């Protein structure tokens, strides 16, 4: 059988760091208010780099660190809800910049679950035997869709990108078990870049494009539905929660992680966290955490670590993949 394997991980964030104190100068908030409610201290905000710029820097790191000829890459998937444009896709822009001339490339839109959904897709492409090598990236420039006068959302988000290189060199299944979910009926709880039909044949008013969020509804969704998803995936894997080495969850809010750990009966230190430095980077949050963990020696990519990856956010979407890293 053919098994996919993650062989490289990389991340990139803009150099510009915006602290809670910086935000207090442009809106009615302060460090204590933000940190006590979210666990966030800083976020990296682009001063000109767009989503494809961040994603390209990640892809170049993956290629350079692996020594792989970019022409041998079969596909590039970019998970994002903040693309440079609808056409061409962010992935197509990345493909051009790195010289992956033989790769097909497309964007996947699943908000904060995007990286997990994209990794699931990539694993199937490789394990089917149809493709040998691919790149999966989560990349966001949320600063361009934020209403910077709205402290309820502006304090939460940051910009960044991260990703992995996969190939067919695995000796065991990459994904042990997975469960992906969507509930479009609750999609209105988290909206971004909403555009009405505007043509000479329709009389519909424009409703704006800034991100809007029903904070309480999203928090309740995260602490109610997501632990059930993780537990269901664990049951499919025949693994107990304590047998997982690390939990890499979407970095939305530290209080959400506290509640997740308690509901699953897992010690909080297994839930890795870096939101204090990056904020919520949507589709980029899980791969940034993964890449940083490898860089800092928390775990390596030797296939010996069992990790839960769980995303949850707009759509509403949520999903878990238990993987062998």
Swiss-Prot record:
Gene Ontology molecular function terms on file: 3-oxoacyl-[acyl-carrier-protein] synthase activity; beta-ketoacyl-acyl-carrier-protein synthase III activity
UniProt keyword terms in alphabetical order: Acyltransferase, Cytoplasm, Fatty acid biosynthesis, Fatty acid metabolism, Lipid biosynthesis, Lipid metabolism, Multifunctional enzyme, Transferase
EC class (word): transferase
Localisation: Cytoplasm
Pathway assigned to this chain's UniProt record: Lipid metabolism; fatty acid biosynthesis
Gene Ontology BP, a term: fatty acid biosynthetic process
Domain of life: Bacteria
Protein known as: Beta-ketoacyl-[acyl-carrier-protein] synthase III
UniProt source species: Lactococcus lactis subsp. cremoris (strain MG1363)
Gene designation: fabH
